[in-house]
Regions:
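Start-transfer (signal-anchor) and selected internal transmembrane alpha helices
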Residues: 1-34
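Helix-to-loop transition at the C-terminal end of transmembrane segments
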Residues: 28-50
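Short hydrophobic/aromatic helix or loop-helix immediately within or flanking a transmembrane segment
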Residues: 67-105, 109
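Transmembrane-helix motifs of polytopic, lipid-linked glycan transferases
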Residues: 113-133
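Short acidic/glycine- and proline-prone juxtamembrane loop motifs at membrane-interface regions
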Residues: 158-164
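Membrane-interface alpha helices of multi-pass inner-membrane proteins
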Residues: 185-214
Length: 217
């Protein structure tokens, strides 16, 4: 019985699973290409920052992704992301060897892999949401491809920063809020927690949702 339920779920979301795997593989290939040419996406100590000045160097040095070493705005963000990033940090620390494996390279690549998974989840959620609108298949594919290969998405995915987590928290909250519309559930409040840990602009979304829900009632 459980096997039948699992199989039905797989068949129902087979397009989403295929897209998720495709995005992960595509971004890994792009990452491999960039890693062979530059360290810019995880180390800004060099002088060839030709994209734009981000907080990557500061965030990487403070290690806010695994162990926040400052007592400021990064605390909640670190508490959430470290659930996934801390094991990566420990693994990279254990394999780092001055003669063979550079810690910054290993840890930078590990964090980018985590961001690739996060980005793929964001794209998959958007794809699933658009699909429910009954949009033409060609238009759906075109919009998805634009999102995958757009410069903002590529930059947020490859540059070790908080951007991609901010995007995912927004998309995840919107999806949950839409599913729970008109229902009494604490899921919306739970889904809102990451909003408070990344950027203040994300916090506005939670309050806007509260206002709209109140007016609709």
């Amino acid at each position: 019985m459980d096997g039948d339920i699992l199989m039905s779920k797989i068949l129902k979301y087979k397009n989403e699973m295929f897209l998720f795997i495709l995005v992960v593989i595509t971004y890994l290939i792009i990452t491999k290409i960039f890693f062979s040419k530059t360290t810019i996406f995880y180390d800004l100590n060099n002088t060839y920052d030709v994209l734009l000045d981000t907080d990557t160097g500061v965030l990487f040095n403070l290690n806010v992704f695994a162990i926040s070493q400052d007592n400021s705005k990064h605390i909640l963000f670190s508490a959430i992301i470290s659930i996934f990033a801390y094991p990566i940090y420990l693994f990279c620390t254990s394999i780092a060897n001055p003669g063979t494996t550079d810690f910054n390279s290993a840890y930078g690549f590990g964090l980018i892999c985590l961001q690739i998974i996060t980005s793929a989840m964001s794209i998959t959620l958007v794809f699933n949401h658009i699909k429910k609108i009954k949009m033409q298949r060609l238009t759906l594919i075109l919009l998805t491809m634009i999102m995958i290969f757009s410069f903002p998405q590529l930059f947020m995915t490859l540059n070790v920063e908080r951007f991609i987590y901010s995007q995912f928290s927004l998309i995840f909250f919107i999806v949950i809020a839409n599913k729970m519309k008109g229902k009494n559930s604490y899921l919306i409040e739970l889904a809102a927690i990451p909003l408070f840990g990344i950027t203040i602009s994300n916090i506005y979304l939670y309050f806007f949702n509260m206002i709209f829900e109140f007016k609709l009632k």
